[in-house]
Amino acid sequence: MRGTPAVLVDGKPVGAKDGSMFDAAGFARTLKGRAWLRRVGAVVEIPAELVEVQLRYGGAAGREFVEGLPGRVAEFLERWGLRVAGPAMHGMTALVLPVVRADGTEAALKLLVPDEESAGEPVALRAWDGRGCVRLLEWDGPTGTLLLERLDAGRHLSGLVERDARAAVTVVAGLLARLTSVRAPEGLRGLGEVAAGLLAGVPEAAGRLADAGERRLLRDCAAALAEVAAEPGDRLLHWDLHFGNVLAGEREPWLAIDPKPLAGDPGFELLPALVNGFRAGEVGWRFDLLTGVVGLDRERARAWTLGRVVQNCLWEVEDGEVALPEREVAVAEVLLGRAG
């Protein structure tokens, strides 16, 4: 019989799936608990930040995710013959456990809250088949649970950008060239739909901005987006390729993780590499390097990047801000030819 995992948050037991409190320490002392721990190799400790975010912002789905983690961890450790091999890691919507497969292969078990963005992740990973990205080993459709190849979570490109921004941007450019060479599979969300939503949201967002110059800037970015929105493209986009989503690997030096896949124009992919690790004066050469390596038409890439600026600005306004983010303003001014 499968045991329920000993799941802790900051060393304290969390509720089990049936709503009862789970005594992790007591469980670990029982015969059943010791047998379970021999299989998984460790107590699974859930990062408190993940729990807090899901309970505060995730609504019913977030609470269900947290309460279901003990049973879900146990289910997939047993189903896929896995043993926990280290402390849990997390993003805002996912728990990642380093594991070892029955044959000794290192892997990562990713349990996440299913949503529109995460639903496309296995589709994209299968299409890329490890070319420039983490390799998908197993996938459960109903829960969205993934088993991925193990990368080095302690070595990501964010560390390199601080020392050598040009080298880091070159890595991202090379990955984008490979990833966007693949045509998007049928059924993925399209950039045309996203662009239409952005354009529809600009008038209200601009009206909330305190500065007239920023209102004009946002509208000008939207005008550039409108020029290309009718031809959204058909490439498989990562949509979140910032430096923290590029990890060191063994079979390749750097590989992309955590895609939020979209079918569209590769020009929509550039902004994270322009604003992450931002330094004034670097926007121009970063844009030149990215468009050159990926092989993009500069004018279309400029317009789609300004569209991505619109997206980030709308998110800020939705969160109650009345001023545009400084990094996005700097990028927009360079691409619109207004930088001093």
Swiss-Prot record:
Annotated GO MF terms: ATP binding; kinase activity; phosphotransferase activity, alcohol group as acceptor
Gene3D superfamilies membership: Transferase(Phosphotransferase) domain 1 (1.10.510.10)
Residues the record marks as active site: 240
Enzyme class: transferase
Keyword Protein biosynthesis: no
Pfam families named among the record's database cross-references: APH_6_hur
EC annotation from Swiss-Prot or TrEMBL: 2.7.-.-
Keywords, sorted A to Z: ATP-binding, Kinase, Nucleotide-binding, Transferase
Swiss-Prot/TrEMBL GO biological process terms: secondary metabolic process
Family: Belongs to the aminoglycoside phosphotransferase family.
Record function comment: Potential phosphotransferase that inactivates hydroxyurea by phosphorylation of the hydroxy group in the hydroxylamine moiety.
Annotated protein name in UniProt: Hydroxyurea phosphotransferase
UniProt source species: Kitasatospora aureofaciens (Streptomyces aureofaciens)
